[in-house]
């Protein structure tokens, strides 16, 4: 099989009127900030998407009864026996904060050296426009769709999809029984293989706070008075071993271990080797797992306790000789099947008390359960076979990713097979500065989604 080169894909993209039209839609989408955490632009972008889908004949429902509006767009086939294909996406993004390094304005889509750059170009606005491009390209040459197609677009995915369960419960009758749900996004790995996965880790996030005194104290008392930051650091250290294993009683007993097929998929996985991760991220510290299979199992199938940030004391110019009275940390546990967010936090509370750190106060912020698809479902196997036609380096199949999303919520509501694949690359820098996708990958995703629609003929 002969595959087009990257330059040939770029040229096809530039000559494709449908793709170019929705590229301009993407430019507009990226220019419209839509950040749930800051409550910025959510209704504006939801309404803009509604208009875009209405223009091409979709039945559009915008539900503004939630903090972030939901947008649902239906394209119906006239076939009485038509199956249903669902695309789940989100239009919210993380902020483009001042501590991120951007070469150009993150909210002005830019193109350089075969790449598109902008906040949301991969996560997840670019996936919306690419998938709509694929649908429109199919409809250009056909009077009817071979499959019903529904788009579900939410605006709170980056904040744990706060209302998705309620929304799906209200609309489940319109969506339950679908043949397949294509998840929000996906990526090619460093070997240029398309990653196809069917699950994700869950998460529980929480704040840990310590108050050691009414006021900051002169540091001359450091040998006799405990300070908030030292107390908090010792408490956190007691929860994790040097190799990264979580030291919380009863946690691992509830973990659902991967089955033989899932471990077999891990054996054939070509990406996330320890050396590759060190190279991509320029790691300066030793890895917690050096042996390949132990590294991969920990990455995909084990929970992880992470510190997102720590704050305490003086951070200004020069010195300030104090014992800070307060310290806080933002923490998370990445969850796997068998672990429930509130239960995990309760176990951590009990462990801190047992370890002698009862003065640490914990505050739950958000949580999501984990999920793993059955990758042998016929609709998922169809995607895997179709993808092989478009990616010269092949595909890499995994039952889960190490990231987090509301797959569990969606499956509970709709009971539909779910698969994730997309247009990102191994260095798309989602959530960081210079978020990007290759133009060639963007166009290949359009072609694959169009082929997926065609496969229902």
Question: Which role does the model predict for each range below?
Answer:
Residues 82-153, 444:
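Active-site metal-coordination/substrate-binding segment of hydrolases
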Residues 166, 222-244:
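A short core secondary-structure module
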Residues 2-99, 326:
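N-terminal helical capping/dimerization or prosegment-like subdomains
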Residues 80, 191, 247-326, 334-347, ...:
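An extended, acidic, His-containing surface patch that forms the Zn2+-binding/catalytic region
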Residues 195-211, 421:
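Flexible glycine/proline-rich, aromatic-decorated loop/lid segments
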Residues 91-93, 115, 152-160, 184-189, ...:
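Acidic, glycine-rich active-site loops and adjacent beta-strand->loop/helix elements
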Residues 124-199:
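Acidic/histidine-rich catalytic neighborhood of metal-dependent amide-processing enzymes
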Residues 91-92, 239, 243, 349-358:
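A common structural junction motif
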């Amino acid at each position: 099989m002969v595959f087009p080169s990257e330059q040939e894909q770029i040229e096809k993209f530039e000559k494709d009127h449908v793709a170019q039209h929705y590229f301009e839609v993407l430019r507009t989408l990226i220019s419209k900030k839509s950040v749930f955490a800051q409550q910025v632009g959510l209704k504006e972008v939801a309404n803009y998407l509604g208009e875009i889908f209405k223009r091409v004949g979709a039945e559009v429902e915008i539900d503004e009864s939630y903090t972030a509006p939901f947008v649902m767009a239906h394209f119906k086939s006239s076939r009485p026996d038509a199956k249903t294909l669902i695309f789940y996406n989100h239009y919210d993004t993380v902020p483009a904060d001042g501590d991120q390094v951007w070469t150009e304005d993150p909210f002005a889509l830019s193109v350089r050296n075969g790449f598109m750059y902008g906040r949301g170009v991969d996560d997840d606005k670019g996936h919306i426009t690419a998938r709509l491009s694929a649908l429109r390209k199919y409809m250009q040459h056909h009077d009817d769709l071979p499959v019903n197609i529904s788009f579900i677009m939410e605006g709170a995915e980056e904040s744990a999809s706060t209302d998705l369960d309620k929304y799906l419960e209200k609309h489940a009758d319109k969506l339950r029984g679908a043949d397949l749900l294509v998840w929000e996004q996906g990526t090619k790995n460093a070997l240029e293989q398309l990653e196809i996965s069917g699950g994700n880790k869950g998460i529980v996030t929480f704040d840990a706070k310590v108050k050691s005194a009414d006021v900051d104290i002169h540091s001359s008392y450091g040998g006799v008075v405990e300070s908030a930051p030292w107390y908090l650091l010792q408490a956190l250290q007691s929860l994790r071993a040097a190799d990264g294993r979580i030291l919380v009683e009863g946690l691992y007993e509830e973990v659902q271990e991967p089955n033989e097929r899932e471990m077999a998929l891990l054996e054939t996985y070509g990406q996330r080797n320890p050396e590759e991760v060190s190279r991509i991220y320029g790691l300066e510290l030793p890895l917690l797992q050096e042996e390949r299979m132990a590294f991969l199992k920990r990455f995909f199938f084990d929970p992880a306790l992470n510190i997102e940030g720590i704050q305490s004391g003086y951070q200004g110019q020069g010195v300030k000789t104090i014992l800070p009275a307060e310290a806080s940390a933002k923490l998370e546990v990445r969850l796997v099947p068998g672990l429930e967010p509130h239960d995990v936090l309760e176990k951590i509370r009990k462990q801190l008390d047992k370890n002698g750190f009862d003065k640490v106060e914990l505050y739950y912020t958000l949580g999501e359960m984990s999920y793993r698809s059955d990758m042998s479902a016929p609709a998922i196997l169809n995607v895997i076979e179709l993808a092989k036609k478009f990616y010269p380096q092949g595909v890499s199949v995994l039952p889960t990713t190490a990231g987090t999303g509301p797959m569990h919520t969606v499956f509970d509501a709709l009971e539909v097979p779910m698969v994730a694949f997309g247009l990102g690359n191994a260095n798309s820098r989602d959530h960081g500065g210079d978020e990007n996708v290759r133009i060639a990958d963007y166009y290949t995703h359009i072609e694959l989604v169009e082929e997926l629609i065609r496969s229902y003929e």
